[in-house]
A protein has these predicted regions:
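Positively charged, solvent-exposed patches that mediate nucleic-acid binding
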Residues: 1-99
Length: 99
């Protein structure tokens, strides 16, 4: 997906997205070992998933989304993470009308 998708960069996240052939959108969250130990990576992934849930109903169908965490996300609070996700989704144009 990284080869065929488009990327958008933010200081704490990278979004790679592309259209899929199915009827549903899918999302994945990636936190590499560069983020920290397992506890830190899991904490980051939980925060990302929590924020993504707020916007998921508004994501148009047929998108594949991958959110890659950057090292700066460890110091970010939940509000900054949610703001970053919203910014990336809007810039990618994958958000539809609010439901």
């Amino acid at each position: 997906m990284k080869d065929v998708g488009k990327s958008i960069y933010h200081p704490i996240l990278v979004l790679v997205y592309t259209r899929n052939e199915g009827f549903q959108s899918r999302a994945a969250v990636v936190a590499s070992k560069a983020i920290g130990n397992a506890v830190t990576r899991n904490k980051v992934k939980r925060r990302l998933k929590s924020c993504l849930d707020q916007f998921w109903q508004n994501v148009d169908q047929q998108w594949d989304l991958i959110f890659y965490s950057r090292a700066a996300i460890v110091d970010a609070n939940i509000t900054e993470i949610c703001s970053a996700i919203e910014h990336l989704l809007l810039e990618a144009g994958v958000l539809g009308e609010k439901k």
